[in-house]
Amino acid sequence: MKKIGYLGLGAWGYCLASLLASKGHKVVCWTTKPELAKHLTDTREHPLLAGHLSKGEMTFTTDMSEALKDVDMIVESVTSAGLRSVFEQVRSLGLPNCPIVITSKGIEQDTGMILPEVVIEVLGEEFRSLIGFLSGPSFAQEVIRELPTSVVGTGYTVEVIQEICETFMTPTFRVYPNTDILGVAFGGALKNIIGIACGISDGLALGCSSKAALMTRGLHEIRKLSVACGCKAETLNGLAGMGDLCVTCSSPISRNFRFGTLLAQGLSTEQARNRIGMVVEGAYTCVSALQLSKQHKIIMPISEAVYNIIQGTIKPIEAVSALMKRTIKEEHL
């Protein structure tokens, strides 16, 4: 069994750390919040996952060097905006020669880089062969209850991909190997924008037909931009693309979906963010996606509408009307 250093203790991080511990791995979890580390040590229950006690051997610390000492694998679940600074800390401590698994979803705003590439830029090109990525349709609230879930494990080498699958796989958590790390990362990041759009649709009570159109045309936008950036189209049709899109666009468990619903109900962006109480990755990814779309001359009307609503330059119902009045064109899926 492995000793695993886990960075980040939001709901998703705690959920995956608990899953790994339940398999017999020793998991040392790092957080920047002393009160959270103490609470988890005392209760074994995460505030965002009430009623679900952790299983197996888990310890909690605010000392990153303690979390990374003599580990066989590093896993992270921090925000996309905080990823670079976290791995700058990791680099300063020195690194063991072990796989590093990224589970955060997003695109870095200033660079337009997928998160595995951000980590490689920080740590050095020599670490590329150790980097992996786990993504797909999954909610912490469901995985912690051991409801059947299927995701994708990817990386830059077959060896790391295989190790991710073997390390995370359980009878209720299935991990499919995939060699297209770029496509998996883009699918996991861009679907959050469409999740906000579908939340807006629900908040405006526009019905199922509206949501179906947003999901279908949204996937088209995701696929166009992703392929232009070097991804394989078939990856976006799988769990990391269409699969993740489905759960994000159809469930209030998704914070991106809830964020969109709140915007449709008249809350400002700041008010909606405060109500959610957690990072809404789609709001940040929207900026990066539109920057990339301009570079590649890709038209993304749904993503642009979401961005304008978030910026407060157009009302949600006006954005819907503008989308419906666009010039007639071939569907071109």
Curated annotation (Swiss-Prot):
SUPFAM superfamilies: 6-phosphogluconate dehydrogenase C-terminal domain-like (SSF48179), NAD(P)-binding Rossmann-fold domains (SSF51735). It catalyses: sn-glycerol 3-phosphate + NAD(+) = dihydroxyacetone phosphate + NADH + H(+); sn-glycerol 3-phosphate + NADP(+) = dihydroxyacetone phosphate + NADPH + H(+). It holds the Pfam family NAD_Gly3P_dh_N. Signal peptide: none annotated. Pathway: Membrane lipid metabolism; glycerophospholipid metabolism. It comes from the Bacteria. It is an enzyme of class 1 (oxidoreductase). The active site is at residue 191. InterPro entries: 6-PGluconate_DH-like_C_sf, 6PGD_dom2, G3P_DH_NAD-dep, G3P_DH_NAD-dep_C, G3P_DH_NAD-dep_N, NAD(P)-bd_dom_sf. GO terms for biological process: carbohydrate metabolic process; glycerol-3-phosphate biosynthetic process; glycerol-3-phosphate catabolic process; glycerophospholipid metabolic process; phospholipid biosynthetic process. The keyword Nucleotide-binding applies. Sn-glycerol 3-phosphate binds at residues 105, 136, 138, 191, 244, 254-256. Its EC number is 1.1.1.94. GO terms for cellular component: cytosol. Belongs to the NAD-dependent glycerol-3-phosphate dehydrogenase family. Catalyzes the reduction of the glycolytic intermediate dihydroxyacetone phosphate (DHAP) to sn-glycerol 3-phosphate (G3P), the key precursor for phospholipid synthesis. This is Glycerol-3-phosphate dehydrogenase [NAD(P)+]. The lineage of its organism: Bacteria, Pseudomonadati, Chlamydiota, Chlamydiia, Parachlamydiales.
